[in-house]
Amino acid sequence: AAMEVIESATQTIDVLFYIISDDDTGNHVVDALTEKARNGVKVRLLMDRLGTLRGPSKAVKALRKAGGEVLFFSPILQLPSSGHLNLRNHRKMIIADHARVFSGGMNIGEHYMSDHPHSDHWVDLAFTLEGQSVQTFCDVFRSDWEVACGEDVDHITTPAPTTAGNATVQLIPSGPDIVEDPLHDGIIRALHLAKTRIWIATPYFV
């Protein structure tokens, strides 16, 4: 599904992940981004510096050479020290043409995306999305990109897409810049509003 979203892009691809591993899966994804950049697609790749300490550096270098923009969120060795070593970005998303999204709990790597029956991989949830909620993903990516590059970027507002399905979707970002806890409030509200069914998918239930 992640590769399908990348391959569908004709104008822009925005990618944000905590981990992109230096393995067959990680290199395959970055190579696909590089090919898109060579073909004139605007590619922006944002990775967490700590999560990608062992990332596919050669493939990323090739992406930059092809015209792709690459930034790291919260570099570890940054002077003067900002004291934000534990400020990590765990978001995961691929946005194609501001119209389609791949997101969820998966990072990019064999441990997350391998379909080999004997592989030691995580069982994780991911989804693809089209419709009006995509704009919120675009806004979140733009905000994180601005933090990483230290300057404002042009805000791209896409025409409101037609409804792609009948699902109700709400993206709830969280972080130290958000004072309240909208995720907690949103979950409680959703539970109260449920009439026939409650499905919960989470790796942790503390």
Regions found by a protein language model. Give the residues of each.
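Charged, low-complexity intrinsically disordered terminal segments
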Residues: 1-206
